[in-house]
Amino acid sequence: MVQRQINWSLIDRVRAKNPIVLNLANLVTIDKVADAVSAVGASPIMSVEPAEADEMVMLANALSINLGTINEHQATQIRTVLRAATPLKPLVLDPVAVSAVPSRLKFAHSLLNDFHFDVIRGNASEIAALVEADNTSHGIDAGKVPNQVQIAETCARRYHSIVVLTGETDIITDGQVVYENPFSAEMLTMNVGSGDMLSSIIAAFLGITTNTWDACIVATVLVSAAGVLANRYSVGLGSWQVQFFDQLSIMDTKALLEFFDESEEDYLD
């Protein structure tokens, strides 16, 4: 359930502060990620050059590391950037498809062993792979992975990170406390890049607060609420994407709280 003590005003603070997010991006979704970061009021940097690492890290308020289209060049860039960023900047890891490709999983484990990430954001099969949990899901998208709360908690404790496990019900945990997002939009699961966008939006929120817990919850609920509202004004995936970016770009704290009040369930209990 949504708790009153969560600092929902972070939405307005992102727009006021305009944090810079350095994205080591999935090239399939790089434009969507840049647009999403911009829509919430932050400024995206989409650098691909290792030689720029020091300068880009100095400019950035937070970093999002995405393994979606990892290759040798990007692996070098990621390590170079992380060496420059640690421990100065908040870091988000998006371990795309580590459950499907052993080499990706090996690389993700090496990053997690060598660097500390404030947040790990992935679907159930990806998070399960990081902790070697048994699951029957294959491919990039998660299927019906059992014990998702337990898997997320295990991952959070192992890597001393907050885990945002996204899916039918989004789970956020620090290994002790668990928050389950009350909102879900089916189109978010159909839209390529929804997770990538969320990872970088979380980074945007980390760029303006040291409260990682609130940043993860507010960013995740914001994206879900925008998805639900987009459903109301769209007829298919194409028009939904337009409405989704519109909702992201106009939603502020007041609008989100009004959305809670309009909902059929009492989300604020």
Swiss-Prot record:
The keyword Metal-binding applies. GO terms for molecular function: ATP binding; hydroxyethylthiazole kinase activity; magnesium ion binding. ATP binds at R121, T166. It comes from the Bacteria. Its EC number is 2.7.1.50. Keywords: ATP-binding, Kinase, Magnesium, Metal-binding, Nucleotide-binding, Thiamine biosynthesis, Transferase. GO terms for biological process: thiamine biosynthetic process; thiamine diphosphate biosynthetic process. InterPro entries: Hyethyz_kinase, Ribokinase-like. Pathway: Cofactor biosynthesis; thiamine diphosphate biosynthesis; 4-methyl-5-(2-phosphoethyl)-thiazole from 5-(2-hydroxyethyl)-4-methylthiazole: step 1/1. It is an enzyme of class 2 (transferase). Substrate binds at M46, G193. Its cofactor is Mg(2+). It catalyses: 5-(2-hydroxyethyl)-4-methylthiazole + ATP = 4-methyl-5-(2-phosphooxyethyl)-thiazole + ADP + H(+). Belongs to the Thz kinase family. Catalyzes the phosphorylation of the hydroxyl group of 4-methyl-5-beta-hydroxyethylthiazole (THZ). This is Hydroxyethylthiazole kinase. The lineage of its organism: Bacteria, Bacillati, Bacillota, Bacilli, Lactobacillales.
